[in-house]
Every structure is written in structure tokens, then in C-alpha cells.
Amino acid sequence: MAISFNSIPSDTRVPLFYAEMDNSAANTARDSGASLLIGHASNDASIAVNSLVLVSSVDYARQICGAGSQLARMVGAYRKTDPFGELYVIAVPESTGAAATVALTVTGEATETGTVNVYTGRTRVQAPVTSGDDAAAVAVSIKDAVNANPDLPFTATSEAGVVTLTARHKGLYGNEIPVTLNYYGFGGGEVLPAGVNITVASGVKGAGAPALNDAVAAMGDEPFDYIGLPFNDTASVNTMATEMNDSSGRWSYVRQLYGHVYTAKTGTLSELVAAGDQFNLQHITMAGYEKDTQTPADELAASRTARAAVFIRNDPARPTQTGELVDMLPAPKGKRFTTTEQQTLLSHGVATAYVESGVLRIQRDITTYRKNAYGVADNSYLDSETLHTSAYVLRRLKSVITSKYGRHKLANDGTRFGSGQAIVTPAVIRGELGSTYRQMEREGIVENFDLFQQHLIVERNANNSNRLDVLFPPDYVNQLRVFAVLNQFRLQYSEEAA
């Protein structure tokens, strides 16, 4: 018998017709992991800590995580950009330490009726002021307006003309929740009522970061291609890097889960450079934003994760540059990084963003990887798209091999077996890999097929006759990053003048 059947026996005697199904040549699916956000829920929230929870909507996140909680805000920021993708969250216990505070000190007496516009992160709070209100009355109005919105990252108290905003959770993250007055300024109709003066100053510095080991354990072996991490301290980033590593982590040959971590940090140029220099991790993207960016760092991380998910799901090799971080408020004009400063950040492993017409957009999603094991400059893992493309290619190969050859026999090239037999040889697999490469070339994932074929090696293992060894040398397509023009102008071509 030449044809290999899976179920129909070769010695059946009962008439007549038998058929079995075989889907090994039908699979055209593309494997992709979901998104994951890690963060704090309210202390009285119903969500179980360190457990994977599927979140379908912002309202559901508010319900189970608590309004105003870090996770609820991150889900809200994520869904602004990716309203469709599959999203999970893991709530981590609040760290020991201190909750960050911000003080708004009110002075003067209102000589006109108006509104105080306080921005806590991206959200504007409007506190009414009546002519004749003194500092204490204005402070109470601000406090009441803040507490009337349960979705804010702060709660408020007031005393003797001073409003104290306290972050809902303890930890370093609270130091990166911006508070300002009149973000849009006079041109946007935001001015303080005459006679009222308000100063904004940092109070207690947030301290502490959660231990993420149990959260990592909760991830198990579920695939997550896009992981949003709000904690940018060294210990938290290194914990996630261990989970992602190539030896025993998600990128190892044993687990083959892949994925990429996105985090964010706001600060001065020197602060961001110092942060980038701490790491050399190809599976981590740390995006740096100006200190005056009017969006909390945790929401920036969630938004960038969402943008990557939307773009990379469609095409892993296409650059994420220009991607809009929907509804994220950038730093105001005059307080944004210059091109020179952006170049510095990108040279120190910090991903960048830019602003066009008031919209915050991705400039370049690099990883923190900069040097090889000897400390020599290495750009092999510079761009996150390279990692996403690698995951796509490896999953594609796995899909082809496991779908078509999951129960095949292995023989040497030149073996004279009958057509229809479930047997592969190195040459058969080589042809299959070449065909798959051609398909990916047409899809714009790889290039240079002829050179790929020249360097491709498929051979039977000399010590294990059941094993095929493959050297698979793809040439990934690249991204258009720089368009350089030498404008060699003339006042008039001499030929024309003649």
C-alpha cells in the first residue's frame, strides 16, 4: 500500500466505501498572541490578585479593578487605540512604601466668577469659583471637583487653602502622574479667575515597587505578544526580562511563546539616558517622554502596547513609526525634545515619540539592546519589529511542519518509496521551506530568495536518525527609516542655455 492512511485499516473486508478526513494540507491560519496589562487594582476590588483575567471592555475593567485604579486607567488608555484585540490583565498587590502626593496651594481672593482647570494626567477637572471666594473656598471647590470624579488617579483633601492630591496606590509610579493647570492655556479658553493664584508642587515622593514574581507565574505558558508594564524600576524590568529570555523564558526553544514588553518613563533627557543605560535587553522597549508630558507613564505604556498590537498584528515587519497614541496628551510646545535629544535617547536604548498637530505619535520603537556579550556595539536587535518578525517567521514554520508532517516517517534522500506515503526526506523538507519562504517573500516579510536557498541547510542528524537539523537563514525585509537627499540644484542647465 503506497498511500498512508491514519485510520482506515488495510485489512478491512466489510464492503464498501470508507473515507477519513485529513486537514494537514488545509491550514492557512496565522498564530498570534493576545495583549496583557499588568498593574494595580483598588484594594477593595473584586479581581483576584496575580490571576489572569480576560477584560473585554473599559466598563468591565472599572467594575472588577476599581474606578481610578491603575489597571482601570491602563485598560481605558489601551482601548482608545485597540478596541478590538483580545486583552488580559493581571492585578498585582500594592507595594510597601509611600503614595505620591501633589500640593496645590491657593492664594488670593477671586475678583471674578470663573473656573479653575486642573489636569490630573489626561483628565481635566473643572472647579467653579465665585467672585469673592477666598483661598480656602477655592481649595474646597477644587477638592470637591477632584473627588467627584472616581476615575482620577488621585483623591483630594483640602486645608487652609492647600489641596493635597494623593495617588490611589503606593509606589514609584505615582511620581509620573502629571498635574498642571490650564493645559491648553489662554488660546484654549483656560485661565485662572482674576485674583486667584495657584502653585503646583510635588509633595511626598512615591516609593516602592511591587514584586512581580507571582504575576509572572500567573502568566503560565499563555502566549502574549504585547505586554504592557507600568513599572519602570530596574527590579521590575529585570523580572520581566527573565521571563522573556532566550534560554529558559518565553523566547526559549522549550517554551516558544515569544512576545515583547513595552514600558514607559517620563523625565529629563539625563534621567532617561541613565534609565536606558541600565538595560541591554532585546525583549524590552522602554519609551521615554518629556517630563512635562501630560499623560501618566502607565497610560503611555498601555497606549504604546495597544498601538504595537494593532500594527504588528497586520504586518510584523512594517514600522510602527507615526502610530498615533490616541488621546494621550503630549508635553506643551517649547517643552518637547529636540531632534538632537531624540537622537541621544535612541542611542541609549530609549524609544522615542514626537508630536504633530498636537497628536502624540511613535517615532521609533527600539529595544534596550545595544551591545553584545563583549560590550561591543550590536544593532541586531535594535528595532522591535525585528523581534516581532522573528516570532512571525518561527510560528509560520512551526505551523507548516506540525500541520503537514506531524506523523511522517523520515528517510534519506533517494529512498524509492511510493507516492502517497507519509515519508519525508531532507530534500522534501528543503522544498517545503523554500515554498514557505516564497510565500513570506510575497507577503513582504522576507527577501532575497536565491541567497536564502544558497545558505539553507537541511540534513539528517548523524547521531539521531529520527531528527532533522535545519539551518534556516531568512533575510528579513527592513524598514524605511531614513530618506536622504542631496539637492544638487542648478540655476539653469548649460545644455538648455545653449
Model segments located where?
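Amphipathic, non-transmembrane alpha-helical segments in extracytoplasmic/periplasmic proteins
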Residues: 137-150, 435
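Second-shell loop/turn segments in exported
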Residues: 125-133, 230, 418-422
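Threonine/glycine-rich low-complexity segments that form extended coil/beta-edge repetitive scaffolds
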Residues: 20-21, 25-69, 79-140, 169-223
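A glycine-rich, acidic short-motif signal
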Residues: 65-81, 91-93, 187-327
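Short beta-strand-centered interaction patches in the first periplasmic/extracellular domains
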Residues: 146, 152-181
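Short, ordered beta-strand-loop transition motifs
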Residues: 96, 109-111, 156-164, 460-467
